[in-house]
Amino acid sequence: TGEKASARSSTPKILFEGQVIVFSCFDNRKISEGFVQVFSKKALSKLRETRVPLPIQTENSVFNENFAVFAENEQNAFYILTPQVMEQITAFQEAMEGNVYLSFSEKSLYVTCSQLRNPFHIYIDIPVEEQRQKIAGDTAILRSAKEILIRAGQSSPK
């Protein structure tokens, strides 16, 4: 999106910085009929223009404290967000130590991981081995998205 900086130009408005991961099949038994979006509540103010219209309250109060859910259809949101899936989303946010945004659409799951720094940026004043360890740690966290989130979908009841 862009915001007018002056009458002649616009500057980009940054809504998110981090990694985006797309899983082509969240759960081979389920298809999301429309979008279901799950946002960390801490970052919700930045995403007002990018969400679908219907806010959803789940029956999990801890999940509701940490996440905002929006969907095109309430029934579909409850179909996708089983108690186990909500627990795994919470576990993934804890592993990320940052803001997490998820969107379910048809068979796909889009996961964005907001991190304070670019895990692949090279710093001159930090030893190479320390940077290598940080990159290995960051990529392990990104791989955990599949282990945590896809596992949740595959083992959730119909």
Give the label of every model feature segment.
Residues 1-158:
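Charged, low-complexity intrinsically disordered regions
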